[in-house]
Structure formats: C-alpha cells, structure tokens
C-alpha cells in the first residue's frame, strides 16, 4: 500500500526546483487568482526555515515591507508556487534562522557565500 502512495507522490514532485538553503535570498513567483483572471506575484526575501519531507516539503521566507516584518510559508511542490529563483547565497551556520525575527537593520544582515570557480 505504501508503495502506491509513494509512486503517486513521486509523480507530483516538481523537477525544476533550484537548490536553496536557509540564509539564501529567493524570489518566489506565486499564482494569485483575482476574480476570473490569474497573475503572478513576486515575494522576495530570506529563507529562514526549510523542511524537507518529499511532497510535503515547505520553506519560510521573511522580508521587511514598509518597516514591518512579513513571513510567508510556502509548500515547495504546490501548484500555487510557479517558480523559485535564488538571487543571493547566504553564509549561515544554522538550519533555522528564527533569531532574525528579533533583529532589524544592520544586525539582521547575512553575509554572502562566495562560490569559488574551479579552474
């Protein structure tokens, strides 16, 4: 029975997702339905948490909008999430960055991870 469930879940997984981790700045394109039309809305912020559970994977993105912190949780393989783009890689030493909730301004900055190019 569990093999059938696993097979159905594997069919619904998105294959075109980029690899991202907590600390990365991402742009999530979300499908928003307004009346009878549908449009894409961008949500850009720092990934503060990631949960890897196959089809039930999720991640939380935090941004500052008009001086107010806004967090939004997304299901990774949801049809509502159109695309995920990584803008910046962050250098952090934690899996969950909940401490950023209490910080603002310069203390909430995250160092950028520099990727070495192999020659």
Curated annotation (Swiss-Prot):
Keywords: Ribonucleoprotein, Ribosomal protein. The keyword Ribonucleoprotein applies. InterPro entries: Ribosomal_bL19, Ribosomal_bL19_CS, Ribosomal_bL19_sf, Translation_prot_SH3-like_sf. One of its GO terms (biological process) is translation. GO terms for molecular function: structural constituent of ribosome. Signal peptide: none annotated. GO terms for cellular component: cytosolic large ribosomal subunit. This protein is located at the 30S-50S ribosomal subunit interface and may play a role in the structure and function of the aminoacyl-tRNA binding site. HAMAP family: Ribosomal_bL19. Belongs to the bacterial ribosomal protein bL19 family. This is Large ribosomal subunit protein bL19. It comes from Photobacterium profundum (strain SS9). The lineage of its organism: Bacteria, Pseudomonadati, Pseudomonadota, Gammaproteobacteria, Vibrionales. The gene is rplS.
């Amino acid at each position: 029975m569990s093999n059938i469930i696993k097979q159905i879940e594997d069919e619904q997984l998105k294959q075109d997702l980029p690899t991202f981790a907590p600390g990365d700045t991402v742009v999530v394109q979300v499908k928003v339905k307004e009346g009878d039309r549908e449009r894409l809305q961008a949500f850009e912020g720092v990934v503060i948490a990631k949960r890897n559970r196959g089809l039930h994977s999720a991640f939380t993105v935090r941004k500052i909008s008009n001086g107010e912190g806004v967090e939004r949780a997304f299901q990774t393989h949801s049809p509502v999430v159109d695309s995920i783009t990584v803008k910046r890689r962050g250098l952090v030493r934690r899996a969950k960055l909940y401490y950023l909730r209490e910080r603002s301004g310069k203390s909430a900055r995250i160092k950028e991870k520099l990727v070495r190019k192999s020659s």
